[in-house]
Structures are given as C-alpha cells and as structure tokens.
Amino acid sequence: MYKELKRFEQILFDACSLLLLVFYTWSAVITPAATQYHRGIYIIVTYILVFLLYRSKSSWFRMIDYLLIIASLTSLGYWLLNFEVINYRVGAETELDTVMAIIGVLISIELARRVVGNVFVVIGIIMLAYGVYGYMMPDAIAHAGSSFPELCVSIFYKSDGIFGIMANVLATYILLFVLFGAFLEKSGAQKFFIDLSMASVGHKVGGPGKVAVIASGLFGSISGSAIANVVSTGTFTIPMMKKAGFKPHQAGGIEPAASIGGMFMPPIMGAGGFLMAELTGQSYSWIMAVSLFPALMYFFSVFMMVHYEARKLNIVGERSAHSGWTVLKAGWYYITPLVLITLLMLYGYSPAYSAVIGLVGCIVISWLRPGTRIGPKRFLEAAREGAENSLKIGATVGVIGIIIGVLTYSGLVLTLADIVISLAEGSLFLTIVLIALVSLIMGMGVPVTAAYLITAVVAVPALTHLGVNELAAHMIVYWLSQDSNITPPVCIAAFAGANIAKADMWKTAFSAFKFAKFLYLGPLLFGYVPEFSLDGSTFDIIKVFIYIAIGTWLYSYILSGIWLQTWFGKREGKKA
C-alpha cells in the first residue's frame, strides 16, 4: 500500500512515522508529555496516516482524502490547542466547540470504515442513534436521550470518549511495542525463533506442527496480532507441515490455533494486557505474572493436541542440520531485547520506557550480523512498518470512543450487566457462556482488542457481582475476545491460515477450533479456580498448578481422539 503512494505522500508518511517514534520515545524516556499532547499527537498523526494509506480509488476522490486530512487537523488540532479552555467551560460549550466535535465524530466513523470495515461502523452508528433516541427504546434499556450535537460534544470532549482510555493506552503502550516488534523483526529475530524451534523439535513426532506452536509463541507474544502472526510465521510453517504429512486443513488450522496464544503470552500480550492494567489499576508486571501460567497451559494444550494428531498420522519431521543448543549459542542475543523488557518491567520501570530500551537493544544486536544491520535506511523502514502496523488498531479509537461514550452517557453499562445476570439466573457458568457468545458476535466486525474493551465494560461488573475477582473477570473477557479468530463462522485468523495452506476454509476453521479448545477451558478456570489467577496461598497455587497441568494433558489426550484409535484402529501416515 505504501508503494502505491505518490512520492510527496511517501515523504509525508515517513515524516509522520518518524514523528511518532521520536515524540513517544522522548515522552517515555526524557520528559512525559502533557495529557492533551500525549493523546492528541497520536490521534492526529494516526488519522493523517490512515487517510494517506487507505486512500480512495479514483484520483478525483483522492481530493476528498486531502480534505479529510485537513478536517482532521482542524478538528483534532482544535481540541489539542484549546484543551484547558474547553475543560474550564464544561457544560457551556460554544458553537465552534460543537461544530468541531461533530466534525471529529463524523471523521472518526469514516476513518474506521476504511480500515476496519462496515460492521464496526454500523455498531458505532447504532450507538449514536441510541444516544439520541434512547427515550424511544424499550423500558429495560431506555434513557432520556440527547440531541445529536450535545452527544457529539460529550463523546469528543469528555475523558471516556474519543480521547479516552483507548487513546491513552494506544499512545502510552501499544504504539511503542508495535514499533519494538517492527525493529525486532528487522534485526532478524523472527528467523532465529523459527530456526531454534526447528532445531529443537522439528525432528520429533509431529515436529513441523510443534515448530509452528513454539515459533508462534515466541514471535506471537511481540507481534500484537494473531492474524499478523499467522501471515508471518505461517508462510514458513504451514508448507512445512503439509510436506511432513499433515492434511492442508490441519496445517492451516494449527498455525492460527498457536498464533492466538501469543495474545496471552508475556511480555507483551498484544494490546489487551496494557488495557487490562489501565482498567484494573494493577501494575503491568502483575498482569504478566498472572498471565504466564495460563498462557503456558494454552500452548501445552495445543502442543499435545498436535503431538497426538501426528501420532495418529505417524508423522515424524526431518532432523535439522544443527541442534537446538547450537542454534541458541549462535543467536542467543536475539532474546536479549525480550529479556530486557521483561526485567525492566519487573523492576518497576514503565512499559513505555522498557519498550524504548528494548527497541534500542534491537538496533544494537542487528549490527552483530552484516545482513541484518539497521542503518538509516532500515531504521526508516522499521519506523514506517511499525507505524503502518499500528493503524489497524489505531483506526478503531474514534468509534470505540463513541461506543464507550454512549454506554457511559446513557447508563447502559449497568443496565446490560443486570440483564446478563438476570438471563444467567445467577449462574457463573451461564454468564461465561453468554459472554462468549457476545464476544463472538462482537468479533464478527470488531478487532479483538476493541471487542475486549467493549465487552469488558459490560461483562466485568456481572462477573464480579457473582464473586469473581476483578482481574480474573478481565482475563475471562480477554481470553474469550480472541474466539472470533478461530471460532466459526468468523474465524479470521483461521481463514488466513486456509489461504496459505490452499485448504478448504471451513475445514480449516473447524480444525483451528479443535486445536484451540483450551481457549474455552481457560475462562472457566479463571472463573471457578481463584488460584489460576494467583489468588490464594503459595501452597494452594502450586498444588492447583500441578492439578491443572495434569488435567490439561488429559484434556488434550481425550479431545485428540487418539485413545479411540488405540482401541479400534491403526495409525496411518508417513515419515517426512
């Protein structure tokens, strides 16, 4: 997409990418920016980049893109430059304040339409209509309603709207970690992760499938997107699995099942972990600690499912030319940026500061090999790719602000929580099932991070009302928000895997659904077993971890169906 831009547009895109990198690095390491600049610069630059990159098809309509860029600069810049004045006159906004708010809200809808799609936008428009015509709704969800201009003012200027929690998390954490991921990839780390996985388990039973699980765990924890992980690691692992003897739909299903585990795996956990820290008030290091064992159990489950599937098909991979230890000795330094980030956060440094130090570490290690050195040209490429990768989630900020703003403005948050509790009749199990259905439906048109935030606003109060601790409640919602990646009929990541595997989309989707079954067990454990989220005595936590590890193995063994084959059939397949 970048290559299709005109030369002056490319220069503008590069300049904006460097501005994001420099400004937020300075803010994280040297001097924190004031709230309005911290959030405002991010949103303004993101809007400019989106209208540059996701452009209109005809040259005539391209002029509209430029007008939208100017309108974005005007409206968002007005908020930025008049932040303190507007805060002083809350409730007494001027006509100009109102006009700028309306422009900002409408532009946010168009921005999301270009990047995310129509379904997400329709949800935002429905929420706007609900905010205006709430008095016409059924009694259970009715509210007084508001005029459209008044609602836009609330959404645009209040702290729970467009410039609210999502904007803060994206500007404070996500952007720098997405940039870190781009620099880590430029340094050659992705190849090292795959080589290490290949050398360690590639020659074992189901070796290529296990390589996909381990490589996706290593790279997925920093890629920030299950789909990006499938597309990047899957281009290597899926053909390798097919060659070894896995059926195309199995190879295409294993990769997305493994890839979504990266969203749970510390140190980065996609965007959700940072949102969780912001919403719960817990330190991110504690979020990482709570997430580690459940994430390991998820990968253990997928790993064992792959193992038993390979045993059924008698698939054994080829031995690598080098041992895992040899590969690790040759490229151990690729792990240092991740170790640096983890240690810094555990020692109390902010995630943003840690990400910057990790990014510098990526540049340093890149110079250890001539082919991966990050000089000025590759530095600009990494900054550009990082900025571009951030747009998928960044483009949601406006419509999420609309949805959260209307939910808060109307009081619908508490109403929906009461409805969920009422429908579940006080049953925790049914409440979790309802949340799973809501997150799946939400995921049909909303990115998973947005689905998590929107669902959490409604579902967490319902779960805590039933006795689940707040962090465990957020974990339940966050895990279930990933289900749209692999659960039919949506399963976006599974469809990406099917495309690479050249397999039937629905067979691949159900294969991914099968391999990722722990995704549905995890939320139940968070709900019913407090120790799973480190809530209990040390002895009880250790005891429960042992039980869960054994149970996860048994769970995978039973779901794989290999015990049926052991009793009634013989293995068939081939050796790679």
PLM region spans:
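Long, contiguous bundles of hydrophobic transmembrane helices that form the permeation core
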Residues: 2-11, 17, 289-389, 492-576
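Hydrophobic mid-bilayer segments of alpha-helices in multi-pass membrane transport proteins
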Residues: 14-18, 37-51, 64-73, 98-107, ...
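Membrane-interfacial loop-to-helix junctions in multi-pass transporters
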Residues: 95-99, 160-173, 199-213, 244-250, ...
